């Protein structure tokens, strides 16, 4: 059995690390470069960096910040935000990322997934999915709808069907973020995560809602996720990554332990 991963997420706005709740009220909490280095030194398995307003503002990602983060860490590094073309992907990979995460750009142009996979390999292509629970309908039979542009635009697309499409187009991984749970620290949306994990054969990262080691354990067991994305739980000093790994491992999950 492969070890499950613990992945800190850096939401970056104007070059600064921020955090909000349900995609609102983001506050400045520090320097993303220093924070990434600290998480790397603590034993994070991977770092995810999102330029959270790049798509909404219709601009490119802050490549200088990506380069600075990449120079400080020596673990897999995934970068997303404002990636709309294969050239955008190339620029992020050249800046030092191992993976690119496409979200709004893939919803608007699904071919970017297959184009990116052909150019760089499926292992480099992550599709980020921002999802909100809605009333079930013919268009949204699962009751989970895809939302883009930082939670601003509902797309009338069913999240489970979109996950299957992404896998078919060549995505190597899915990062499934529940807008309803984001930043609440009340636990992951396990029903959503499990439905998607059961619908695809590629790795699924659970995102949104981590508030305790038990929440993370639930995501990688009951939720079927291969990794747990975390933010508030470590950004505000509630836990360190070694704390989390020790407690989750003690519950019976297989993790890569801190050296």
UniProtKB/Swiss-Prot annotation:
Regions annotated as coiled coil: none
InterPro entries registered for this protein in UniProt: Aldolase_TIM, His_biosynth, HisF, IGPS_HisA/HisF, RibuloseP-bd_barrel
SUPFAM superfamilies: Ribulose-phoshate binding barrel
Superkingdom as given in the UniProt entry: Bacteria
Key words of the record: Amino-acid biosynthesis, Cytoplasm, Histidine biosynthesis, Lyase
Pfam (any one): His_biosynth
UniProt KW Cytoplasm keyword: yes
GO-annotated molecular function: imidazoleglycerol-phosphate synthase activity; lyase activity
Active site: 11, 130
Biological process (GO), any one: L-histidine biosynthetic process
Catalytic activity: 5-[(5-phospho-1-deoxy-D-ribulos-1-ylimino)methylamino]-1-(5-phospho-beta-D-ribosyl)imidazole-4-carboxamide + L-glutamine = D-erythro-1-(imidazol-4-yl)glycerol 3-phosphate + 5-amino-1-(5-phospho-beta-D-ribosyl)imidazole-4-carboxamide + L-glutamate + H(+)
GO cellular component terms listed in the entry, alphabetical order: cytoplasm
Primary enzyme class: lyase
Entry's localization field: Cytoplasm
Main location: cytoplasm
Pathway where this protein functions: Amino-acid biosynthesis; L-histidine biosynthesis; L-histidine from 5-phospho-alpha-D-ribose 1-diphosphate: step 5/9
Documented EC number(s): 4.3.2.10
The family this protein is said to belong to: Belongs to the HisA/HisF family.
HAMAP family: HisF
UniProt-listed PANTHER family: IMIDAZOLE GLYCEROL PHOSPHATE SYNTHASE HISHF, IMIDAZOLE GLYCEROL PHOSPHATE SYNTHASE SUBUNIT HISF/H IGP SYNTHASE SUBUNIT HISF/H
Job of this protein: IGPS catalyzes the conversion of PRFAR and glutamine to IGP, AICAR and glutamate. The HisF subunit catalyzes the cyclization activity that produces IGP and AICAR from PRFAR using the ammonia provided by the HisH subunit.
Subunit structure: Heterodimer of HisH and HisF.
NCBIfam families: hisF
The name this protein goes by in its record: Imidazole glycerol phosphate synthase subunit HisF
Organism in which the protein naturally occurs: Nitratidesulfovibrio vulgaris (strain DSM 19637 / Miyazaki F)
